[in-house]
Amino acid sequence: MELLKKRILEDGNVFGEDVLKVDSFLNHQIDVKLLNEIGKEFKRRFENKEITKILTIEASGIGIACIAAQYFNVPVVFAKKHQGSNMDENTYESEVFSFTKNKSYKVRVSKKYINTEDKVLIIDDFLANGNAACGLIDIVREANGEVQGVGIVIEKGFQNGRKTIENKGVTVESLAIVESMKNGKVIFKN
């Protein structure tokens, strides 16, 4: 997605060779016009799939998933990272490791919101090692739902996330694939 790549080059910040900070437009301050275009692009890429729900993980994926859901006309479910007092105790759970936070945590989805009839599109902001997406795939499969694909805004193509997800038999569509971030410069895969 050229508009997204252009924005990453203009406003993204590289730290080391593996951290890309896009908080000025994607995951802290949100450019809603850009997110609308991202939502349309996800719809275009998955238009041949039957989607009944979009699943993401709190917090950065929620805004992206909600905008995309408008184009699919389906609800969004997000996996919670914390068992709050208002969280249903009857949940599907999966352990995921966060590359960003460098720690593991359990994510949960109420059994009320994912079931055997669901055909789920998983959406997230970043794909690095694939742990978050794989955790969500496991939750959908535990519910006997069907994963229709994984939509990623920015993929770190130099990490193994895509391969990990594809090894589970799931298609990945990334809107921008970063091939490398050497010398503070983002290079995209063609």
From Swiss-Prot:
Highest taxon of source: Bacteria
Molecular function GO terms recorded: xanthine phosphoribosyltransferase activity
GO biological process, one term: purine ribonucleoside salvage
Catalysed reactions, as listed in the record: XMP + diphosphate = xanthine + 5-phospho-alpha-D-ribose 1-diphosphate
Matching CDD domains: PRTases_typeI
Binding site for 5-phospho-alpha-D-ribose 1-diphosphate: A128, N129, G130, N131, A132
Keywords assigned: Cytoplasm, Glycosyltransferase, Purine salvage, Transferase
Keyword Oxidoreductase: no
GO cellular component terms listed in the entry, alphabetical order: cytoplasm
Residues the record lists as binding xanthine: L20, N27, K156
A Pfam family this chain is assigned to: Pribosyltran
EC class (word): transferase
UniProt keyword annotation of RNA-binding present: no
Localization annotation: Cytoplasm
EC number per UniProt: 2.4.2.22
Pathway: Purine metabolism; XMP biosynthesis via salvage pathway; XMP from xanthine: step 1/1
InterPro entries per record: PRibTrfase_dom (IPR000836), PRTase-like (IPR029057), Pur/Pyrimidine_PRTase (IPR050118), Xanthine_PRibTrfase (IPR010079)
Function: Converts the preformed base xanthine, a product of nucleic acid breakdown, to xanthosine 5'-monophosphate (XMP), so it can be reused for RNA or DNA synthesis.
Alphabetized NCBIfam families for the sequence: PRK09219.1, XPRTase
Subunit-structure text: Homodimer.
HAMAP family linked: XPRTase
Protein name per Swiss-Prot or TrEMBL: Xanthine phosphoribosyltransferase
Organism ancestry: Bacteria, Bacillati, Bacillota, Clostridia, Eubacteriales
Gene that produces this protein: xpt
